[in-house]
């Protein structure tokens, strides 16, 4: 029996991130049905065939097909990976104008199908595009999720795990804020296998400089990867698959995603990366970590950066 029976995902955007996300869904049998939409119909046709050939080896049967926007009408989840890609030397915020125009069209097409599920947004700048998707769709805020800092937090945990020689799953540490240059680590609540990071650093003060460098590596990882191979895709695709799994399994899992704030962290009317409880209904609630003064100030700066960009966007006025 397929424990994910009835779970349908429509993927819009079959580039590197989208196609690897699609493979992750099939490989892990997270969905019952996967529909792929992209302007490049021939690539979709090829990927659908390739993915179908993988399904005999997936844990359960997954139906995969090429589709169109009308297929969204009974989808449980629409995942948007479409949009202009980030180029070397270009910040995520540089992509705003180009991708807002693309999203206005995409979300309009999806909603015209009578879609009544959850949106998951991965395209950059993800915080602004998640906000735009919420505005353009008219759906409740709980049903529009951005991938946020889920990848940044994974990078952060990985680097900390390597520094302390433990498994990444034994590290509890979050990156919050904009998925971009103004993001910040929540040092005050980071722990390694239950031991506060602050305590561990008191035992090895020479490690403080190394830890600070870990955040710089986390923040700048995308630029390094883009410079080396043109784009990042494996990590974010796995992050999207993890969010999808949390939704369909009704996990009440806490993940760092882009969510709308309505007073949490002293911020309003902005989608930004924060820990949130994810289940079958989307975002159950935002988890408000008590930040110290420095962290709160940096978070406010991150939120202001996003708000300032949105204030200039004609598509959001």
Swiss-Prot record:
GO terms for molecular function: L-lactate dehydrogenase activity. The keyword Ligase does not apply. The keyword NAD applies. NAD(+) binds at residues 17, 38, 43, 69, 83-84, 105, 122-124, 147. It holds the Pfam family Ldh_1_N. Its EC number is 1.1.1.27. The active site is at residue 179. GO terms for biological process: glycolytic process; lactate metabolic process. It is an enzyme of class 1 (oxidoreductase). Substrate binds at residues 86, 92, 124-127, 152-155, 232. Pathway: Fermentation; pyruvate fermentation to lactate; (S)-lactate from pyruvate: step 1/1. Its main location: cytoplasm. The modification Phosphotyrosine is found at residue 223. Belongs to the LDH/MDH superfamily. LDH family. This is L-lactate dehydrogenase 1. The lineage of its organism: Bacteria, Bacillati, Bacillota, Bacilli, Bacillales. The gene is ldh1.
